[in-house]
């Protein structure tokens, strides 16, 4: 696991928890598989397509650009 994967996962978890969302709720809002959210938050390397970045960002209340910069 790379440092950027871990950082992205930590930020996603923090944003999700601030909004009082569970992983299943975030997965549903972002229209992503729960396993994808779980892997992401645990710092595993996942391939974020532009579409997935957009859906995840909207579900977390941030822009796609902000989310992309976290994972850069």
Locate the predicted segments by residue:
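A short, Lys/Arg-rich alpha-helix, primarily the initiator
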Residues: 1-18
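Residue-level recognition of specific faces of alpha-helices
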Residues: 11, 36-39, 66
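Alpha-helical residues within the helix-turn-helix
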Residues: 17, 28, 58
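Short alpha-helical DNA-recognition segment
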Residues: 20-39
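Short, conserved catalytic or interaction motifs in soluble domains
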Residues: 39-42, 72
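DNA major-groove recognition helix of helix-turn-helix/homeodomain DNA-binding modules
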Residues: 51-66
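Short amphipathic recognition helices of helix-turn-helix/homeodomain-type DNA-binding modules
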Residues: 66-72
